[in-house]
């Protein structure tokens, strides 16, 4: 195993815990950016170009018949082939959190339609499900099993907001483990069926799942109800005859206690588990090898990588599987330095790499026609993410040109900012105050100076006043700047004075010219 530090030369502020990586024919693509996509890359999907230990995020485009794909954190992803012999594969994306902390229940299918030297074109389609549709969730897993020449998606675990009937003002943003049901999803016809298995008693999230042929292994995970990381190991086998599918579960010994671990495949029947947590505030520094042979699973410890001091002393870490036995890891930067990075990134190679190190992309070294092992890399968001978002997600690189000058900086206009010295709005404890609020606080724009956003609740605004200000075009000043605004009296409008026209210095004559004959006639007339 080799650990190498890499530098992200652009768009480093977009990488955050909960992102996902997709590997298409050796090319790695980044998905799940921080904030909503901007005009530089409206798709939110980037090509992760690695060259000489430098990483560049290159924008990709969608085809005209594609649907919109929001940036999702902690979704369930897996590869999908029509059959085991098929060479082309697609990625299935289900659930996840949007930048507004809304949990998605949609399922998307990603495939590549065109590749050239400059940009990659994806086709993204939304799949509608009928039947026992899984509720919106995140931190779960989805895998594909193959049996009797047919394929089926298997979805399990995750967390979601409490049902609307159980949500109270004090616990409006509280989450709970989803019921321990196993969902079978037919991607061809869009049918979903749920199964209740007696062996699965408690809900799990941020677990590791491995799929091979008709079998899925689930190990580790975190139970929110009991606040434990059980060392369970489940084997779920799916049989797909002509009639109804048969699903059975077996509890196996030899599991490990870990959550938010990353799984990567090193060869046909061997996988490596990296990272994760064994306690709420303790990282799991050891790695394990998982071998799948003859319908058996074997878990054993392996040589620990030479972790750097920064990784050892970091409270959190996160990452995703790049494919080909390589893991992309990130840790928070050092906030004590004057100029600090938001995150530091590393590449951990768990498999022997015989390819040239100067190669720009990773080549797929898998020779098996079976579906590669699927895992969903996660980070315990309730335990680590929200604390990291407050001080670590605003890191920016000096070469980062992603944020255009004419667009607002989301780190300054977010809903969870400290709007004033007395602001007490916290993402973990906030509850709706106005009837118009649902899952984020109402805000109003202060027109003082360059302007800034404040929480309406912190300004003690009545709901009627808030609605009136939101509907009108009147300027609003927050409690801190209202006295300054009152002191700046605008002078009353004065009508301009009518200036009399300037008189000519010489008095003009009548304009009549008397000839000498007329003068003589007038002289004789009056005489």
Swiss-Prot record:
Keywords, in A-Z order: Chromatin regulator, Disease variant, DNA recombination, Metal-binding, Nucleus, SCID, Zinc, Zinc-finger
Gene Ontology CC terms: DNA recombinase complex; nucleoplasm
Any GO MF annotation of the entry: phosphatidylinositol-3,4-bisphosphate binding
Main subcellular location of this protein, as a coarse class: nucleus
Region: Disordered, residue numbers: 357-380
Binding residues for Zn(2+) 2: 446, 452, 478, 481
InterPro entries hit by this protein: Gal_Oxase/kelch_b-propeller, Kelch-typ_b-propeller, RAG2, RAG2_PHD, Znf_FYVE_PHD
Record-listed Zn(2+) 1 binding positions: 419, 423, 455, 458
Subunit-level organization: Component of the RAG complex composed of core components RAG1 and RAG2, and associated component HMGB1 or HMGB2.
Record comment regarding domains: The atypical PHD-type zinc finger recognizes and binds histone H3 trimethylated on 'Lys-4' (H3K4me3). The presence Tyr-445 instead of a carboxylate in classical PHD-type zinc fingers results in an enhanced binding to H3K4me3 in presence of dimethylated on 'Arg-2' (H3R2me2) rather than inhibited.
Cross-referenced PANTHER family: V D J RECOMBINATION-ACTIVATING PROTEIN 2 (PTHR10960), V(D)J RECOMBINATION-ACTIVATING PROTEIN 2 (PTHR10960:SF0)
Protein name: V(D)J recombination-activating protein 2
Species annotation: Homo sapiens (Human)
Taxonomic lineage of the native organism: Eukaryota, Metazoa, Chordata, Craniata, Vertebrata
